[in-house]
């Protein structure tokens, strides 16, 4: 009986050590933002870290991480979150010419490091294969937009969190500015979280 208990305890200890070793290999969200890696490696690490993962336009991991972040900032408490946005090039959705030009540049992964200090938001965006952030911008507001898409869209519903400086702007205003040919119609914003679903 003692021998059986020893074997069971040994097996549990080995399993526990293996689990700890795996956790130590996965960087936390802060370390992950600074990690230079391929898009596929970054995607795998983001799924193992406390990060929000968006593939294409669909949330695939970290929904609870985002919810906890949004709850804190909604109360005015400082908080940070890392979003990993992964993109592939779909041959069926682009012209053959564009596909041939761009195919070697995909997949791509962008890290969005979002910090809230209690009064303003700062977002740093870095492609996983680059050392330095491509952009760093500050915004006053984080707005939440939900709704239904037109019948011709690929998804039925959307859920977006967008940084902007205008607390009264709507998603329709932002979209109109993006597609307008009018000088000055663009509304400064950064979509940090986008989830489209049926």
PLM feature spans:
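Positively charged n-region of N-terminal signal peptides that target proteins for export
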Residues: 1-6
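Sec-dependent N-terminal signal peptides
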Residues: 8-10
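C-terminal motif of bacterial Sec signal peptides marking the signal peptidase cleavage site
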Residues: 16-19
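Extracytoplasmic electrostatic interaction patches
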Residues: 90-198
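N-terminal export/targeting and maturation segments
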Residues: 22-112, 117
